Amino acid sequence: HFTLLRAHLQSLPGEHDYGSLVAHDGLWQMAERTAHDVTARMALVPRTLEARGLDATPPIQAKLRQLGHPAALKAVDILDVIVRDEVGHVAIGNHWYGWLCQQQQLDPLAHYRELARRYRAPRLRPPFNWVAREQAGFVPAELQALQSEASG
């Protein structure tokens, strides 16, 4: 992903490269906060932050398509590759989070809520990419909980 995005940035007019634009480091901060707890890491990095990328990508792509500029349309294509790969990353996180909860005899839904609170995970807001989340292994109960929490 880095290589695709960096090459695209470098192809744009002006001097653009990795690091020349402002970006957040929320994923890295969460990785540091959960470094001592693999269950928390699986719950909050792939299942929360990377999954949020699944949600955010379609609206970003829609805005880029509206621009109609070749560079914007190239970015849409790059985001297609990234979101497809991210479904796999989130699926791996879902698998291992479920396995870890089973090994520790934890209820995955209840434990997720506790971990999100304890580690100050960002509150997830719509829109949600339900199809990508299902492809990534989120079960109906998790999707219903996500919808309920976002609504209330």
Where are these regions (language model features)?
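Non-heme di-metal
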Residues: H1-G152
